[in-house]
Every structure is written in structure tokens, then in C-alpha cells.
Amino acid sequence: MDYRSAGVDVEAGRAFVDRIRTSVEATHRPEVVGGLGGFGGLMRLPEGLRKPLLVSGTDGVGTKLELAQDHKSHHNVGIDLVAMCVNDVITSGAEPLFFLDYMATGALSPDAMAEVVEGIADGCRQSGCALLGGETAEMPGFYPPGRYDLAGFCVAVVEEDNLIDGRRVQAGDSILGIASSGVHSNGFSLVRKILECCAAGADTRVGPEQTPVIEALLKPTHLYGALVRTLLGANTRIHAMAHITGGGIPENLPRCLPKGLMASVDPHSWPRPELFSWLQTQGELQERDLWHTFNLGIGYCLILPEADVEGARTLCSNSGFESWVIGEVIPASEPQDGPVAGLPA
């Protein structure tokens, strides 16, 4: 009896690390010290910071992993993992520095695992952060063969004086919604249930490009870090930002607002992607459930003065993102019909 007969192939693990080395090292920033394979990743803080604040975030991809593995969308789900973490930490105005990943599997599949890590590295390159390290755990008997789970961890930095924490938000500020790529990485327990029960079939085509539903569902989550850096670099006066994840706009937009203020959103101010209408029809979903589960086409929100909206929209367009003014900040009213005025409570 040996470790391999127990289900753990150490040699395959070494070969896997060698295979991903080039992709990982391509993400490294000048501040990275050393290379892949040490007990810990090392990185200097960027030069010129006076009062740096570190911002951290950790997340996973949820049950989107189930669909991704069924349809061999390993690269895309690696991007999803980075996006779920990076899109959170940048809401404070921070610059992502490095990313760590954790991957657990029942039996190491070098091709699939390499695709995942290459997707993670792709997401890191797009976000300007280093893939500083990670852990791949082979756990036979705990996970079924061919299945894996993912978790990610990101650290970013922001000058304390430049921290975006909602304190500057005022009544009358505009809410700019930035387009999502689709469902992103939330609500997939419901999505999977709909796919199990629907009669239309997962090969149904949706949207202006007639994309197969499965392909539309597995599009990677948009990464908003480069766009936010562009906006801040142009001195856009961003007062707050929200990453629209689980709970949709009603549960995420209020998180970035100070006490005494609330958001008012016009649900007809942007076009709802056909994919969400398809999910609603096939799942016979109530409108409230739709709003409180999915992003409905808005993946990220900026709160900024009305005077800055036109310039911000131009920068969004130049960066390849559609955007819409979807509402404004108003004084909080008592009693409230819901967390966001204009949307189902």
C-alpha cells in the first residue's frame, strides 16, 4: 500500500505545478518577490503610499461549478473566481495586489485543473493583480472523482485619504448601473433547478445573437477593476460603489449607502437581458424572487454626482461596458416599502 493506491498521485501533482508555472508567473507584478513553490508568497507594497489600507475579500463560485464541470467550462469558472473577489474589494477604491486560490478535488485531473488555473491567471492579468500562490488538495473519498471545489482570496490596497466608503454620498447623487455579462456567479442553485424542470431544453437559444442557454449561463463574470481604475484615474468623483451579487440590486445597493439615505431605482431604465426573462418563464418565478436572486443585467453600480455622469458613461463605453442611469439617492423614508424604492420589497 502507498499514497497513490490511497488515491493521491504526488507525481501528477508535481507535473501539474510545472504545467501552470508559466501562466502563474505571467501575472506577477514588479512588487512580487521570488517565484512559485515556496511556503508563502512574498510581495512588497507599491512605492509612494503614505497611509496604505489593505482591503481583503474571499469568495467562491457557488453551484455554478456544477454546470461548469458538466460542460467543461473550466477556464471561464477560473475567471469567475477572480471576479467574485476582485469586484468586491475594488468597491472601496482599492487596487488589487495579489490573489490566492484553493482548489479541492477527489482525483487530480491535470487538464481540467490546468484550465481552471489558467482561467484564474487570466482573471488576475485582467485585474492587474498577481496570482501569488495557491493550494490544490487531492481528497479521494471526500469529493467524487472528476469534481472539484474552488475558493479565492484577494488583497488590495488604497490610500486612506482616497478610501471610498459611502461617507460622501448625498441625496440627489445619480446611480449608474454597469452591464453584467449575464447571470455572473449567483443564483445557480435556482438556475440548476429550472434546467432540471424546464421543458424547453438547455439548447434553447436566447438573446440577439441566439446564444445557447448553457453558453449564456456560463459566460464569465465581468471584471470591473480596470474600468474602476480608469474612472478614478480620470478624477471621476465616485462616492460609493456596489457589486451586485447574491440578493440582486435590492440587497446589495443599500450596503454602500450611509444611514438616512436610500436608493430609488427605475426598473425600466435599462433593457432586461432575454436570458433572465427565459429563466422567469421556465421557472414560473415571481418578479420579487427574480429581483432578489439575480442581477437582471446590472453587475456593478456607481454612485456619483449628476455632473460626473456623462463623463463616466463615456469612459464606460470606451472600456467596452454599457451603462445606464438607473436611479438616484433619496432621503430614507419611514416606513419603507423595501430596501430600494421602486423595486419589489
UniProtKB/Swiss-Prot annotation:
Its EC number is 6.3.3.1. Its main location: cytoplasm. The keyword Cytoplasm applies. One of its GO terms (molecular function) is phosphoribosylamine-glycine ligase activity. One of its GO terms (cellular component) is cytosol. It catalyses: 2-formamido-N(1)-(5-O-phospho-beta-D-ribosyl)acetamidine + ATP = 5-amino-1-(5-phospho-beta-D-ribosyl)imidazole + ADP + phosphate + H(+). This is Phosphoribosylformylglycinamidine cyclo-ligase. Pathway: Purine metabolism; IMP biosynthesis via de novo pathway; 5-amino-1-(5-phospho-D-ribosyl)imidazole from N(2)-formyl-N(1)-(5-phospho-D-ribosyl)glycinamide: step 2/2. It is found in: Cytoplasm. It comes from Synechococcus sp. (strain WH7803). The gene is purM. SUPFAM superfamilies: PurM C-terminal domain-like (SSF56042), PurM N-terminal domain-like (SSF55326).
